[in-house]
């Protein structure tokens, strides 16, 4: 016996000219004007995506993420705010971190973003892992990500 679960777009508030490719799971989130969401994307609750931002395929955006305007999120980016401090998932949402992405940020494919803040105008290299907040505009890459060049 198989259980088939369909993709869902539920309780999404969206602006004008939003494009969402199926299959996708989006719920309890806000999408600004001209947002693009590629296929196989999940955007969880209490998340806001700013106007003119693009979320490419196979990206997972957990709860409590804010993405600014004119941002680019590459293919397969993972946002994670439960750091498994006890070695297992924590169901207490109050303990989850928050992720804040400024305006004009570009995040390369395959990057992992933990509970951090990223200032405006940052470029994150593909495959990078962000473990600490970024307060300086520039190109960042690596595991853990570090500043490679000021912009």
Q: Can you say where each PLM-predicted feature lies in the sequence?
A:
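Flexible, glycine/small-residue-enriched loop-and-beta-strand segment within the central core
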Residues: 1-9, 20-31, 35-118, 143-151
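Sparse recognition of residues in long alpha-helices and their boundaries
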Residues: 87, 137-138
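Short coil/turn connectors at secondary-structure junctions
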Residues: 102, 135-136
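C-terminal/domain-terminus segments
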Residues: 121-133, 139
């Amino acid at each position: 016996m198989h259980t088939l679960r369909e993709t869902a777009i539920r309780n999404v508030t969206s602006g004008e000219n939003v494009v969402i490719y199926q299959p996708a799971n989006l719920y309890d989130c806000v999408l600004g004007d001209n947002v693009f969401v590629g296929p196989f994307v999940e955007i969880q609750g209490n998340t806001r995506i700013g106007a003119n931002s693009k979320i490419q395929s196979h990206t997972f955006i957990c709860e409590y993420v804010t993405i600014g305007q004119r941002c680019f999120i590459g293919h397969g980016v993972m946002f994670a705010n439960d750091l498994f401090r006890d070695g297992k998932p924590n169901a207490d949402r109050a303990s989850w971190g928050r992720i804040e992405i400024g305006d004009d940020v570009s995040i390369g494919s395959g990057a992992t973003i933990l509970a951090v803040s990223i200032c405006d105008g940052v470029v994150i290299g593909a495959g990078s892992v962000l473990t600490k907040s970024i307060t300086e505009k520039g190109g960042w890459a690596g595991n853990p990500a570090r500043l490679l060049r000021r912009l």
